[in-house]
């Protein structure tokens, strides 16, 4: 078995404190690579040798360890620690834990020394806890240096929401403490400060807490309530931490050694610390010279990452919840004290608010970015140094203290923001609203003046429009009379044109009526033909049904006759067969008759011979003949037997022949039946073909008839559309003729008017010249005193109407 002598200490708290993702990933990768590794690493304080892996079973290793008696015991204790750090045995010395001091019911190995590396672990953990306490107390101090006013809820809702806020703050405090512990554990692993430094840091925190409690008595009632609630929370947390530290302490000796190293706290008179604010450049600003403890505290505070904006909000919300849940009287006093604070800006509305740059503020330092150290650091942007200089040159706010806390306001629109900024925004908004009101008043005056000016201009324009309308009205009255005269003339022309148009229209209507009557007559003829064709179709259908009935009757009769014919044929065949048989029998009988006749004749001859034989018998001459006859009879009997056998054979042949003939008869009958069925099928097919041909002919006739009807309709529709198109074209032409006629009439009227006007002018000139001549003649007659001639001249010159002028009517002028 091999053991790795370079294995790290198997500390159970390292995984909880060092939450390093890289180590866990490496361990997981190592476990995946070798999950069943037999070689294990062992804890050892020995320096690294030449070989990484050493076996305790080798002779060299045993020879090197012979002088050290405690080697095996120490290795065993380091490898198998059986006592927990939180057990009751951790407060006792290892020498007191012998065989006699262990009770019987204790399930623990006997005479095993307490592992010494756990004491080092306890010291390291105690150092980390002290660092966490320092950071937590610093955060509480920063919390006291801030005061939050919640403007998102009313005063009536404050008492209702205390329980929910307390629960939320408790959960947020647990989460913040866990996050701070994790961050502090990481920092503790990196920095690894000594025990003496940790004790000095605890002394510094003790001095800071005493100074804050001594100075907090001079603050207002609201800050007292906040500090009391925070002190109570810290006391509870300190008690809990004391319990944890007592349970985690190893023994009396280690606890005493840890307490001895703690320095005595500095008195509150000498240890009053003014909090400092560090700029981004690293400089500190305070009114008091920092002491050594303050410097150490500053170094410890710098190690802690400053809380982000969200963590600050959570801390402030926790402070508010603790104030509401723990001290209701402190709430009332806080409300009384907060109301004058919030009413101060209202009473001092005319005064300018506090400058946000002069308001107290909790110092906050952003995490410093790592500077470039590689080759690219040579090409630093020039803007980075200028920005750093500008950041260092920026003025900072005064440091907030519990006596002079930073006032923060919580709003719905902007969340958490400084009260000075909030007052500044409200003050600027008020000034802006006043400026807007003044601007609106000035703009309204300008608008009213401009509106009045525009109204006057509009009134002048309206007066001009009225004058123009009056003049237009007078002109319309003058022109309306002229228009009336020309209108009357045009009306007469239009009446004549309409009369002519109506005459033509009547002619066209008569023509269309005649065409319509003709088309209707043609339509009626087509309908009559269609009805006749329908009657013919009905007759054909009736005839078809009758033919079908006759066909069915004929088919039934044919089938019956065919059956009767088959039966008669069968009977005839039977009769023929019987006749053939009878004829054969007759022939056979005739043959037999002839044979018998011949036999009788022969027998007669034989009888005569027999008589002669008898005579010879009597004469005893028959004996040789008898012998011959017997011989013949025996031969004949043999022949008879042969004939009988042949007859039997012929009978068997006859039965076979009859059977064959019967089979042939049946086959012939089947063939006759098949032929009859085939004949019937052919007749049916023929009739079906004839029926289909007749139906096709009827269908074709119907289609032809429908096609003729559709053609007639199509021709009718085409003719109708042609007539309509012709009518439309004629109407268009008529309309064009009308328009042309009206245009020509208008031109003619205009020409006639101009001609009439010229004629009127000429007539007027002629009348004037005639009157002038008449006046001259009358004047000459008067001068010559010839009354008779003058009377004659006057009677001849004067018109019939006894007037100086000749009047012509409008019709005479138009149709002259």
Swiss-Prot record:
Protein name per UniProt: Uncharacterized protein YGR130C
Organism: Saccharomyces cerevisiae (strain ATCC 204508 / S288c) (Baker's yeast)
PTM: Pyrophosphorylated by 5-diphosphoinositol pentakisphosphate (5-IP7). Serine pyrophosphorylation is achieved by Mg(2+)-dependent, but enzyme independent transfer of a beta-phosphate from a inositol pyrophosphate to a pre-phosphorylated serine residue.
Biased composition (Basic and acidic residues): 292-316, 770-792, 799-816
Region (Disordered): 1-34, 65-101, 154-406, 770-816
An annotated GO cellular component: eisosome
Keywords recorded for this protein, A-Z: Phosphoprotein
Biased composition (Polar residues): 83-92, 246-260
A GO biological-process term: cellular response to glucose starvation
Biased composition (Acidic residues): 317-326, 343-353
The keyword Transport appears for this protein: no
Biased composition annotated in UniProt, kind: Low complexity: 18-32, 161-223, 327-342, 380-396
Phosphoserine: residues bearing it: 286, 343, 347
């Amino acid at each position: 078995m091999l053991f790795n002598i370079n294995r790290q200490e198997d500390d159970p708290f390292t995984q909880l404190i060092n939450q390093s993702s890289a180590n866990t990933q490496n361990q997981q990768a190592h476990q995946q690579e070798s999950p069943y590794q037999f070689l294990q690493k062992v804890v050892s304080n020995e320096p690294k040798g030449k070989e990484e892996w050493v076996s305790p079973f080798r002779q060299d290793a045993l020879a090197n360890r012979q002088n050290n008696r405690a080697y095996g015991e120490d290795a065993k204790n380091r490898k198998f620690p059986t006592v927990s750090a939180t057990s009751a045995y951790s407060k006792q010395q290892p020498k007191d834990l012998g065989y006699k001091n262990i009770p019987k019911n204790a399930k623990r190995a006997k005479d095993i020394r307490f592992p010494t590396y756990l004491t080092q672990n306890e010291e390291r953990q105690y150092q980390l806890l002290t660092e966490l306490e320092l950071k937590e107390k610093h955060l509480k101090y920063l919390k006291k240096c801030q005061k939050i006013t919640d403007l998102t809820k009313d005063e009536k809702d404050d008492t209702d929401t205390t329980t929910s806020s307390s629960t939320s703050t408790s959960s947020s405090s647990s989460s913040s403490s866990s996050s701070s512990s994790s961050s502090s554990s990481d920092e503790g692993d990196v920095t690894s400060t000594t025990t003496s430094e940790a004790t000095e840091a605890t002394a510094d925190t003790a001095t800071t807490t005493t100074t804050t409690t001594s100075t907090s008595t001079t603050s207002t009632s609201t800050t007292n309530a906040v500090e009391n609630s925070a002190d109570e929370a810290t006391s509870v947390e300190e008690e809990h931490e004391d319990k944890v530290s007592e349970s985690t302490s190893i023994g009396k000796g280690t606890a005493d050694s840890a307490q001895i190293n703690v320095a005595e706290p500095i008195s509150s008179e000498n240890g009053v610390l003014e909090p400092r604010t560090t700029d981004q450049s690293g400089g500190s600003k305070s009114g008091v010279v920092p002491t050594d403890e303050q410097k150490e505290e500053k170094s410890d505070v710098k190690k802690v990452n400053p809380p982000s904006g969200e963590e600050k909000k959570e801390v402030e919300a926790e402070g508010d919840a603790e104030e509401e849940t723990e001290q209701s009287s402190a709430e009332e006093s806080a409300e009384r004290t907060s109301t004058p604070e919030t009413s101060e800006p209202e009473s001092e509305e005319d005064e300018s608010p506090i400058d946000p740059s002069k308001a107290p503020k909790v110092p906050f330092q952003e995490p410093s970015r790592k500077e470039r150290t590689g080759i690219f650091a040579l090409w630093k942007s020039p803007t980075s140094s200028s920005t750093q200089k500008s950041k260092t040159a920026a003025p900072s706010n005064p440091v907030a203290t519990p006596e002079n806390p930073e006032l923060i306001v919580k709003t719905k629109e902007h969340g958490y923001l400084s009260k000075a900024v909030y007052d500044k925004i409200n003050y600027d908004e008020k000034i802006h609203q006043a400026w807007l009101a003044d601007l609106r008043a000035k703009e309204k005056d300008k608008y009213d003046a401009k509106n009045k000016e525009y109204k006057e201009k509009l009134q002048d324009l309206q007066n001009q429009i009225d004058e123009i309308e009056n003049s237009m009205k007078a002109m319309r009255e003058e022109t309306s009379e002229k228009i009336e005269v020309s209108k009357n003339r045009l009306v007469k022309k239009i009446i004549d044109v309409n009369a002519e148009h109506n005459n033509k229209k009547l002619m066209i209507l008569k023509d269309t009526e005649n065409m319509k009557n003709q088309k209707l007559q043609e339509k009626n003829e087509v309908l009559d033909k269609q009805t006749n064709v329908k009657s013919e179709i009905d007759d054909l259908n009736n005839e078809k049904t009758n033919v079908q009935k006759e066909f069915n009757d004929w088919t039934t009769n044919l089938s019956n006759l065919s059956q009767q014919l088959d039966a008669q044929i069968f009977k005839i065949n039977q009769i023929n067969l019987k006749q053939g048989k009878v004829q054969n029998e007759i022939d056979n009988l005739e043959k037999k008759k002839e044979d018998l006749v011949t036999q009788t004749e022969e027998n007669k001859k034989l009888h005569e011979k027999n008589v002669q034989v008898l005579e010879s018998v009597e004469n005893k001459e028959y004996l040789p003949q008898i012998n011959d006859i017997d011989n013949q009879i025996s031969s004949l009997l043999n022949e008879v037997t042969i004939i009988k056998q042949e007859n039997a054979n012929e009978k068997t042949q006859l039965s076979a022949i009859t059977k064959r003939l019967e089979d042939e008869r049946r086959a012939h009958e089947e063939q006759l039946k098949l032929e009859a069925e085939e004949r019937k099928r052919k007749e049916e097919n023929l009739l079906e073909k004839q029926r289909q041909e007749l139906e096709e002919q009827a269908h074709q006739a119907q289609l032809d008839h429908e096609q003729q009807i559709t053609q007639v309709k199509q021709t009718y529709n085409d003719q109708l559309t042609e007539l309509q198109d012709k009518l439309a074209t004629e109407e268009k032409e008529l309309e064009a003729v009308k328009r042309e006629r009206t245009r020509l009439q208008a031109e003619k009227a205009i020409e006639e008017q101009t001609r009439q006007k010229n004629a009127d002018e000429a007539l007027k000139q002629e009348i004037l010249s005639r009157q002038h001549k008449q006046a001259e003649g009358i004047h000459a007659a008067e001068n010559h005193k010839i009354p008779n001639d003058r009377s004659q001249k006057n009677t001849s010159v004067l018109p019939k109407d006894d007037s100086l002028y000749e009047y012509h009517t409008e019709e005479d002028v138009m149709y002259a």
